[in-house]
């Protein structure tokens, strides 16, 4: 395993023998009971001045490049900068053409994870942000999210998926192309899933919002914002111990300081 010389934080990348992992940092935000994501600059902003109960999180999809695929793990908030999707810009800064993304793996459909999956055209229609890619989502998560709606979900950002010809609706747990293992976990929301990417002896693990930050892996607590907080706690403990024993590389979507951790 080789670690490249550090790049600016948001574009840090690690190169493995067969796998390159790039955190695509969209920035730090606070979120409270309103479910709104407010930009937060650690250098100038004071968390104590935000609404009571505000959580400080990073929004951080991941690009995983293997010998077979260019994978995108979740898609961020869907913000635009200079009329271009922020996630497209971040992928280009990593030296990759967004059109080369072959698979979009969605852990669940909360807005901070799926809003970059599509983009709105001038006529108001929404199309796939990665038209060459196959999108993967749990079928019951899509059905549940559309039924549940706001504020937990924003169907406007993902309803287009239903009519997408290159959408694969997953059921339960299974395997994609013999090396991407998806696991239906529930926990954070009823039909949340996580991904294990295993190739040539390397094992990258993306726990979505069941395992969003490294510090949560090291302590036992039940989060009020989870659908089943106890299940999330138990899964984190299980993965953390197993991952350390087996040498997993953990990808943390909401971690400000540690987007990637490995032994």
Where are the language model's segments positioned?
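Active-site metal-binding loops of divalent metal-dependent hydrolases
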Residues: 26-28, 75-78, 109, 140-141, ...
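Core dinuclear metal-dependent hydrolase active-site scaffold
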Residues: 18-26, 60-65, 71, 172-200
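Residue-level marker for buried hydrophobic side chains located in beta-strands
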Residues: 71-73, 105, 135, 204-206
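Pre-active-site segment of Zn-dependent metallo-hydrolases
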Residues: 39-61, 65-103
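Metallo-beta-lactamase
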Residues: 85, 92-96, 129-184, 189-262, ...
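Zn-dependent metallo-beta-lactamase
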Residues: 8-68, 238
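Active-site metal-binding motif and surrounding structural segment of the metallo-beta-lactamase
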Residues: 83-136
């Amino acid at each position: 395993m080789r670690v490249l010389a550090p790049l600016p934080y948001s574009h840090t990348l690690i190169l493995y023998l067969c796998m390159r992992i790039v955190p695509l940092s969209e920035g730090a935000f606070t979120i409270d009971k309103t479910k709104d994501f407010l930009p937060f600059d650690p250098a100038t902003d004071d968390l104590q001045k935000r609404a009571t109960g505000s959580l400080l999180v990073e929004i951080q999809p991941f690009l995983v490049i293997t010998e077979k695929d260019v994978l995108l793990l979740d898609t961020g908030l869907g913000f635009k900068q200079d009329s271009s999707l922020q996630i497209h810009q971040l992928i280009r800064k990593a030296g990759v053409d967004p059109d080369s993304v072959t698979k979009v793996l969605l852990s669940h459909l909360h807005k901070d994870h799926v809003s970059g999956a599509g983009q709105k055209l001038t006529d108001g229609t929404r199309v796939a942000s990665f038209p060459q890619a196959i999108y993967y989502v749990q079928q019951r998560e899509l059905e549940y999210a559309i039924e549940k709606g706001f504020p937990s979900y924003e169907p406007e950002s993902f309803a287009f998926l239903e009519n997408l010809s290159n959408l694969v609706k997953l059921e339960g747990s299974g395997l994609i192309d013999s090396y991407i293992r998806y696991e239906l976990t529930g926990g954070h929301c009823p039909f949340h899933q996580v991904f294990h990417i295993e190739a040539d002896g390397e094992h990258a693990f993306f726990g979505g919002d069941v395992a969003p930050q490294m510090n949560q892996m090291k302590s036992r607590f039940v989060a009020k914002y989870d659908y089943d907080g106890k299940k999330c706690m138990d899964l984190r403990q299980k993965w953390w111990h197993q991952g350390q024993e087996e040498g997993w590389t953990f990808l943390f979507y909401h971690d400000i300081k540690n987007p990637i951790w490995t032994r």
